[in-house]
Amino acid sequence: MFEYKRFLFVAIFALSGFVQSKDLPNFTELAEESSPAVVNITSTKTVSNRNSFGGGFGDPRYDEFFERFFGQPRPSDPRQNSRPVVSTGSGFIISKDGFLLTNNHVVEGADEITISLGDRREFKAEVIGADARSDVALLKIDAKNLPTLRIGSSKELKVGEWVVAIGSPFQLRFSVTSGIVSAKGRSIPNGSDSTYVPFLQTDVAINPGNSGGPLFNL
């Protein structure tokens, strides 16, 4: 009798899990329809490295050393080595003629921006406009008849709703992750100022390379 009860308990528990799983959303259609309008962004900019006496001293303590023992600032090394720095991010197309959105920090100060589409085509992009406080940048590529995404409104979005992100974390292009809306109306400190755009907080997995990618509600 004891064995029978244990089997009955396990069977009911498994059935309960099956019923709950039927209520989980299916993201396949959204991923298939939306992924073509999501892009991978590679930006390159040049930074300068100052080397002192070829030894790579950049510690302020060496400045204090020269001031104390020689009575003058440490002489600067005229040699400056510049090197390219490459960063990656995501974005999404908002018009068939090549306008797209991303985060400003993905392309800020970039000398060159390359956009990679889902069909493996690549284009050089131009920054049309950017706003550092809201961290949004508008880019343009020379292409036609592109797949697009429509910008939605978050007014009716509720905490606890399912959301999906598509992007290129760690350069793993067009990856889909899901989660829920954790909170609305968040602001992010920006030095002495606070960002004036209310952000959504979500538990969707966001990693380096996801920046600038779209977040979808169902």
For each feature predicted by the language model, list its residue ranges.
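Serine-dependent protease modules
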Residues: 20-218
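Pyridoxal 5′-phosphate
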Residues: 9, 13
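Bacterial N-terminal signal peptides that target proteins for export
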Residues: 1-8
